[in-house]
Amino acid sequence: MARKLISSGSKFEAEIGYSRAVVDGEWVFVSGTTGYNYATMTISDNIVEQTEQCLQNISAALKQANASMNDVVRVTYVLPNASEFELCFPVLKKYFGNVRPAVMMLAAGLADKAMKIEIQVTAKKQARPAGKKKPVAKKKAKVAALKKPAPSAVKKKVVKAPAKKKVAGKKKK
């Protein structure tokens, strides 16, 4: 399979000479991505909003690569102020809570003082049946459904559990 280059349209990609993402076989390498909204070339001054925008930008790049956030296997976070990382946890959990990729966080300066976080991901595309792509929400719902016991099994456990305890300890009168 040929290498595929993906662009977000960010002016930085052309100026510096890099791709938002590179697809090589089943692997997708997404460059360090900041919280810029590439349509407006604006950035929030709030780290939580920047984190959300970073992950939206990454999700869009993965989609162009025929991958999704569910395919992410490694994430690197870079923050100029490491003490702000905890503020990002709810947003990160929203995107990666079920995926649980390998992660590393670094404290380092970024290219612009307005940038409060930069996120880089590596994804490995999962095998999918030809012509069928499962939306993330449906896939998560299916996994959750598989983990839940059938209602009849729950009722049987509730009914049988006390009987087992009584049989082991005392006889019924």
Q: Where are the regions that the model predicts?
A:
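N-terminal presequence-like segments and the immediate start of the first folded domain
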Residues: 1-56, 60-65, 70, 79-173
